[in-house]
Regions:
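TRNA-recognition modules of translation machinery and tRNA-sensing kinases, especially anticodon-binding
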Residues: 2-318
Length: 318
């Protein structure tokens, strides 16, 4: 873990030193989780975006592009569920005054079981040498199976509590696991509360007559509200796709990991519309297709794996 953190720090240092990424407004002490792409970074991002656009749009007859605006009618976000469901469960430590995502605290705790499993694997590999079968070991070793079961039980309980909006049980789980504040070591927690991730703003010349708006938290809704327009004017027949790239904004309270978790970021997204009942088939087709595209970037096959989420977005079923 320490080695990975050192490597991550080296990447950040390299990105700044060689003109790829700068801290935004750095001369004024910067702004947390907001970054500027520098002279080399902007070219790298443009090349990647152009390559994605060519592969996703220009090489498919049944996929077209779109450039929707950042501002949308506020009813859009009510209808999509973002106003009511686009939330993070947050918890404060009373002693450090630090705020955390409750689910991340629990997931970080479960990750310790993965570290323990890795230690068991290393010990066994050293003990058995060339005869060591890692797959069989992971499937049969009692300690490993015990760690897996504990982690799975914790995540299952958390997932059920969040799904049922039982935030009291999420706090109870944190207390039962003895999770402490990473900063202070204190276990003195507040209740868990939901926090909406959308940035709000106003449209209008005066405050009393202004309309509440949001900076879009994703590009997908611009595609959905233009579905009929694109279908009619482009004479598109299902199955077909609509793609776009553009800025999105999320008021991340726990923003970390450099450019991998920002409050302002760019998305490259394609929504593919299919007939009901065929979504699983198309899902697998696109999983295979997109993996080939990622591998074509030359970063190595071993650096990619599919991760099936236990906790899905409020609008997803896979």
């Amino acid at each position: 873990m320490a080695k990975q953190e050192d490597q991550f720090k080296n990447v950040i240092s390299h990105a700044k030193e060689y003109g790829y990424v700068f801290q935004s407004s750095e001369i004024y002490d910067g702004l947390s989780a907001v970054y500027d792409y520098a002279q080399n970074g902007v070219e790298l991002k443009k090349n990647l975006r152009d390559y994605w656009w060519k592969a996703m749009v220009q090489m498919h007859d049944n996929i077209v592009g779109l450039d929707a605006s950042i501002f949308m009618h506020p009813t859009t976000w009510k209808a999509s569920g973002h106003v009511d469901a686009f939330n993070d469960p947050l918890i404060d430590n009373k002693d450090s005054k630090k705020r955390y995502r409750a689910d991340v605290l629990i997931e970080d705790y479960v990750a310790k079981y993965d570290d323990k499993i890795e230690k068991e694997v290393k010990k066994a590999a050293k003990r058995f040498g060339d005869a060591f079968d890692k797959v069989q070991f992971l499937e049969t070793n009692p300690r490993v199976l015990g760690y897996k079961a504990k982690g799975a039980d914790i995540l299952a309980r958390m997932g059920k509590s969040l799904e049922q909006e039982d935030l009291a049980d999420v706090k109870s789980l944190i207390e039962e696991l003895g999770i402490a504040c990473p900063l202070s070591g204190s276990k003195n927690w507040t209740d868990v509360k939901q926090f909406n991730l959308m940035f709000g703003t106003k449209l209008g010349a005066s405050a009393e007559h202004a309309t509440d708006l949001y900076l879009r938290p994703e590009t997908a809704q611009g595609i959905f509200v233009n579905f009929l327009n694109v279908q009619k004017t482009g004479r598109m027949k299902i199955p077909f796709g609509i793609a776009q790239t553009g800025k999105a904004f999320r008021n991340e309270i726990v923003a970390r990991q450099f450019i991998f978790r920002q409050r302002e970021f760019e998305q490259m997204e394609m929504q593919f519309f299919v007939r009901p009942g065929t979504q699983k088939e198309w899902y697998e087709t696109w999983k295979t297709s997109r993996l080939k595209w990622h591998i074509s970037l030359g970063l190595g096959v071993d650096n990619y794996r599919f991760h099936d989420h236990d906790k899905l977005a409020h609008y997803a079923d896979a």
